[in-house]
């Protein structure tokens, strides 16, 4: 289409051909330990790249090998899947298996996860497209705003808000002189606009009303198994109901932003975006199914176990390959990668129904984090916890410095607390660091300049946490 500056097919910016070793190396930048889990997801991602190179007939026959990650909370299960999706620019959805109910019961049915993934895919593609047309949209928005501020005689398409004091009409007799004077004035206005000298001015824009996302009379359909019917009815009514423009008074910076969004929307090719969103969700979608152990049954089934088995049976066709109607069209789930995870303390993977077990052929056990792992988590990742706190407090002029013995002491306390109480993995570090830095976070902005350099060494950590650690009741609830 000639109106759209980008005519080539949209492709994910991160769809590069990384080898499994390179994928693991990139995951290592953010996640400590868990080599086996990283290898499993790296192979799964690489197999997608391999599959794309095959002829269509063979491509259709190759399905993703879904993965079950087994390990306690806080060891990196979710983070591995999340980082993997970012690495390949894939639509990613994390859901909890316990949130779904068997068909016929009140609650969300399992197909809703595919509908949610489709919406994520559409938003992802739209954002990528907007990034590509950002400069064009900015230029068009600037011209549109100048048209409002200083319209050609008799013209004002978007709204009103002319700034007076400029001769733009019959005061100049000659047409050419009038045009030259107008263009000079327009450039003068452009400079004022770019330098922010017009930021206090208000303009009235005639902008399209956002599409109605919910029709009140249909909200009764917004839950449970009627999600799909609700979506279809809203889509139909959205097309039938007239779209009206709405006049809004905005300051110049806000008006410019609103016009940029409006112009970007005009540059967007809805059919192309929808096609790419559909392709992306079907070929690259990743669903992280957490707490799958909670829907695993046990021997001697009670009523609750029977209900859990119902969810498993509803989940089976989605994982196996089905077609689900969504807002962007029918989505085939055959090639969506499912990564399930669970602690499996009270159950084991073999407690899942055999048919579902067969759809998750790869099983990876994640290791419990050691004291050395905690030390690495605090320092090695690109956005490690210590770097995050250093960056946050630097905005108040506080210079945090973590010494080696300070890091070791924090890691030791985290490991010991996990051993003595509930093992929450790396999340224990968050609670400890919050407690440790509570005082400096609160007092920091008011500290004199001479006290704004804070060194977190072993003694600092011990002094602030020893009392809490020694008090068993306190440590259980605070750390």
Curated annotation (Swiss-Prot):
Pfam families: AAA_2 (PF07724), AAA_5 (PF07728). Its main location: cytoplasm. GO terms for cellular component: HslUV protease complex. Keywords: ATP-binding, Chaperone, Cytoplasm, Nucleotide-binding. GO terms for molecular function: ATP binding; ATP hydrolysis activity; peptidase activity; proteasome-activating activity. One of its GO terms (biological process) is proteolysis involved in protein catabolic process. CDD domains: RecA-like_HslU. It is found in: Cytoplasm. ATP binds at residues 32, 74-79, 290, 355, 427. InterPro entries: AAA+_ATPase (IPR003593), ATP-dep_Clp_protease_ClpX (IPR050052), ATPase_AAA_core (IPR003959), ATPase_dyneun-rel_AAA (IPR011704), Clp_ATPase_C (IPR019489), HslU (IPR004491), P-loop_NTPase (IPR027417). A double ring-shaped homohexamer of HslV is capped on each side by a ring-shaped HslU homohexamer. The assembly of the HslU/HslV complex is dependent on binding of ATP. Belongs to the ClpX chaperone family. HslU subfamily. HAMAP family: HslU. ATPase subunit of a proteasome-like degradation complex; this subunit has chaperone activity. The binding of ATP and its subsequent hydrolysis by HslU are essential for unfolding of protein substrates subsequently hydrolyzed by HslV. HslU recognizes the N-terminal part of its protein substrates and unfolds these before they are guided to HslV for hydrolysis. This is ATP-dependent protease ATPase subunit HslU.
């Amino acid at each position: 289409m000639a109106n759209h500056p980008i005519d080539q097919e949209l492709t994910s910016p991160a769809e590069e051909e990384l080898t499994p070793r390179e994928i693991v190396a990139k995951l290592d930048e953010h996640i400590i330990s868990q080599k086996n889990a990283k290898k499993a997801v790296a192979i799964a991602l690489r197999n997608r790249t391999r599959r794309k190179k095959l002829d269509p007939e063979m491509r259709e026959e190759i399905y993703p090998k879904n993965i079950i990650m087994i390990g306690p909370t806080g060891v990196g299960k979710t983070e591995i899947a999340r980082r993997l999706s970012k690495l390949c620019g894939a639509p990613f959805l994390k859901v909890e298996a316990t949130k779904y109910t068997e068909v016929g019961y009140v609650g969300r049915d399992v197909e809703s996860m595919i509908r949610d993934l489709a919406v994520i895919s559409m938003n992802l593609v739209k954002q990528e497209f907007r990034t590509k047309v950002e400069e064009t949209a900015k230029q068009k928005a600037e011209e549109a705003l100048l048209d409002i501020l200083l319209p050609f005689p008799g013209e004002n398409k978007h709204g009103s808000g002319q700034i007076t004091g400029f001769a733009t009409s019959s005061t100049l007799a000659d047409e050419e002189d009038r045009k030259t004077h107008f263009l000079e004035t327009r450039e003068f206005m452009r400079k004022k606009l770019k330098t922010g000298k017009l930021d206090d001015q208000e303009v009235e824009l005639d902008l399209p009303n956002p599409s109605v996302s919910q029709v009140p009379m249909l909200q009764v359909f917004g839950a449970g198994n009627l999600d799909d019917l609700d979506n279809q009815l809203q889509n139909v009514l959205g097309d039938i109901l007239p779209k009206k423009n709405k006049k809004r008074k905005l300051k110049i910076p806000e008006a410019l932003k609103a016009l940029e969004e409006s112009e970007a929307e005009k540059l967007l090719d809805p059919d192309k975006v929808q096609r790419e969103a559909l392709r992306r969700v079907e070929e690259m979608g990743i669903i992280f199914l957490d707490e799958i152990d909670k829907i695993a049954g046990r021997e001697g089934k009670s009523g609750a176990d029977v209900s859990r088995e119902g969810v498993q049976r509803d989940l089976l066709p989605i994982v196996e390959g089905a077609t689900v109607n969504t807002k962007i069209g029918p989505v085939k789930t055959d090639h969506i990668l499912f990564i399930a995870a669970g602690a499996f303390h009270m159950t084991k993977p073999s407690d899942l129904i055999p048919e579902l077990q067969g759809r998750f052929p790869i099983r990876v056990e994640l290791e419990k984090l050691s004291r050395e792992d905690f030390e690495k988590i605090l320092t090695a990742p690109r956005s490690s916890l210590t770097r995050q706190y250093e960056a946050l407090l630097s905005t108040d002029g506080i210079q945090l410095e973590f010494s080696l013995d300070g890091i070791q002491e924090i890691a030791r306390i985290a490991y010991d607390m996990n051993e003595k109480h509930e093992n929450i993995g790396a999340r224990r570090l968050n609670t400890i660091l919050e407690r440790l830095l509570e005082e400096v976070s609160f007092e920091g902005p008011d500290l004199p300049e001479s006290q704004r350099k804070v060194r977190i060494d072993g003694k600092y950590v011990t002094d602030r946490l020893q009392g809490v650690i020694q008090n068993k009741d306190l440590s259980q609830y605070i750390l």
